[in-house]
């Protein structure tokens, strides 16, 4: 139950800081929420990406809640769908997964928030194909082109380690798939079209999600 409660608190903290607080800060500083979600966001590759990410978000919230719900039913060993199948064992593996999960979730939240701040006025949720924003290449963006998404991936992995059940695993897989579609099929083509050679030069040296991996050929 402790692990599930920690995962629930971390999920709420991530949502409040990365979505609510960031939106409020952006609105206060720039007079704009930064959200670019429209009907066009639900067509083509963007629709696939957003659908996967929405499902991942729902499952990510459901995973610790499901673990909490069944934690009072010891007659169900391992839980429904493997909920807390690892956490219920008093083993070294459980201790390691708890520590790693907490570290990754906290680090993922921190990376996400820092990257959002470094984007400044260019920060967006969604994409308006008619809008041109400044290309941010400093800070975390000097080594990774999508550090916000890297942070989100770390957070999801941390949650899956904290509450190792099928819901958390599905959330991780769907979330990573959604980020891949969003970046490769939606954002990278837009940035190449908008910023051209400047984006290509930067993308040849900065990794896609991990430093040194996924750079574009110049």
Question: Locations of the language-model features?
Answer:
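Active-site-proximal inter-transmembrane loops
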Residues: 126-149
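Hydrophobic, membrane-inserted alpha-helices
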Residues: 151-158
């Amino acid at each position: 139950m402790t692990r599930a409660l920690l995962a629930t608190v971390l999920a709420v903290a991530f949502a409040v800081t990365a979505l609510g607080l960031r939106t409020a800060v952006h609105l206060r500083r720039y007079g704009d929420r930064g959200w670019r979600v429209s009907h066009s966001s639900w067509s083509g590759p963007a629709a696939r990406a957003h659908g996967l990410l929405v499902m991942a978000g729902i499952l990510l919230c459901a995973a610790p809640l499901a673990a909490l719900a069944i934690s009072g039913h010891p007659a169900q060993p391992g839980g429904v769908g493997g909920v807390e199948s690892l956490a219920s064992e008093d083993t070294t593996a459980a201790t390691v997964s708890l520590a790693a999960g907490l570290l990754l979730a906290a680090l993922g939240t921190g990376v996400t928030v820092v990257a959002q701040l470094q984007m400044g006025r260019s920060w967006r949720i969604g994409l308006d194909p008619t809008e041109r924003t400044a290309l941010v290449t400093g800070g975390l963006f000097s080594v990774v082109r999508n550090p916000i998404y890297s942070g989100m991936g770390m957070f999801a992995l941390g949650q899956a380690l904290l509450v190792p059940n099928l819901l958390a695993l599905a959330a991780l897989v769907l979330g990573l798939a959604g980020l891949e579609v969003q970046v490769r099929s939606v954002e990278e083509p837009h940035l190449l079209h908008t910023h051209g050679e400047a984006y290509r030069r930067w993308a040849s040296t900065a990794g896609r999600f991990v430093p040194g991996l996924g750079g574009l050929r110049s």
